[in-house]
Structure formats: C-alpha cells, structure tokens
C-alpha cells in the first residue's frame, strides 16, 4: 500500500527533486562527474541541459499549483511522464547497451524505482475520486 501523503506535499517534494535533477543535468558538460558516477556521458551535453531547463519549468509549475485548482491535472501529467521515464530507464538497463559500470547501473535502477514510486503517488492523487 502506498504512503498516504497529501497531494500538495507530493507535488512540492517532486518539485524539489525535479529542480535537483535539473542542477545535475546542467552539469552534463562536466564529463568527469558522469564518469565518476559510472553514468553515460551525455553527448552532446546540450540535450541533457535542455532537459534540465524543462525540469526547472516543471518544478515551478508543481510548486505553484500545489494545493490549488489544477493540482489533479498536473499530478496526472507528472504520473504519466514519470512512468514513461521509469520504463525507458529499465528498458535501456535490460538491453545492456548503456556504457555504465556497477555504480551507474545501481544509480539508474534507483532512479527508475524512484520514478515508478513517484508515478504511483501522483496517479493516486491525480485520479482520486473527490
């Protein structure tokens, strides 16, 4: 059974996570960081940085809409996006085509699990019967 967290809190926590991931993606031109973590180095870094910019925008929307009208619709969209992202990470990990080491694999499995949990929490809040 999923935790019973208020929808407002789920959106605010997710906004903080999105902003944190955005900061990491902004550093995608720093190859040594990705190599240290055993993660694939984004080439070109521009795409990862663009994703970081999009995540900043999403974090702002999540923070501002928390506890307000439109919260359920945002939660639904975030649930779908998080589920898709988790699925993509798992597919890539299972394909064995990612240039990662043991540390990188562990990090990506954790991220996939976190995204799946996030998707479930947002889905429960987004499709809850009033």
PLM regions with names:
Residues 80, 102-116:
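Individual transmembrane alpha-helices with interfacial aromatic-anchor signatures
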Residues 1-18:
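Cytosolic juxtamembrane helix and N-cap/initiation of the first transmembrane helix
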Residues 23-36, 88-93:
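Membrane-embedded alpha-helical segments in integral membrane proteins
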Residues 16-27, 43-67, 79-87, 113:
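Core segments of alpha-helical transmembrane spans in multipass integral membrane proteins
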Residues 113-130:
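Membrane-water interface at the C-terminal end of transmembrane alpha helices
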Residues 87-107, 124-128:
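Membrane-helix boundary connector in multi-pass membrane proteins
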